[in-house]
């Protein structure tokens, strides 16, 4: 039985990944920051173990991974966004996005790596975004952090590959999650119309891609776009 750790697992893509891996018989732990009610609901539904942890807090992350023990798969899904002009983003907001979206991955990789190196085996899947590939107006900070995730993914794949550890990323497009709740309906409709498939994605779409990368033995350093063709590279 494989042990999977998923960050940001109380809702959206993270919760869908928890359900998918648990449904396939994995031993699942998920981290969440503050949505206790949602975390309890996901844990009850799936039998997964929930740990309250801000991934930007290095010490808290280490405590969480100490509780987990040895992990076979790490899914770095936790993330925050900010919508607004670059001139409107405060330094504190900018730093918070990097602390969660980039430093959070660094903290989790550092915490899980000793176990994976000892076993000479492991899989890491990072959740980026199509905006990390092409950028988005009024989402400069978010796009920048997600671009950093892609660069980190490729660098780690080269660094850790000789140790039997694969590192890949998914780059979701417009997915119907709480992160999109504040987006005006007409904007969402416009995005749907720009998507070649004529649909918006679901958390389950992204979770399926995550599960594939976690289990693909000859795939590393790759970015799997899950965007309905919105961005084709």
Residue ranges and their predicted role:
Residues 10-11:
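Conserved glycine-rich cofactor-binding loop
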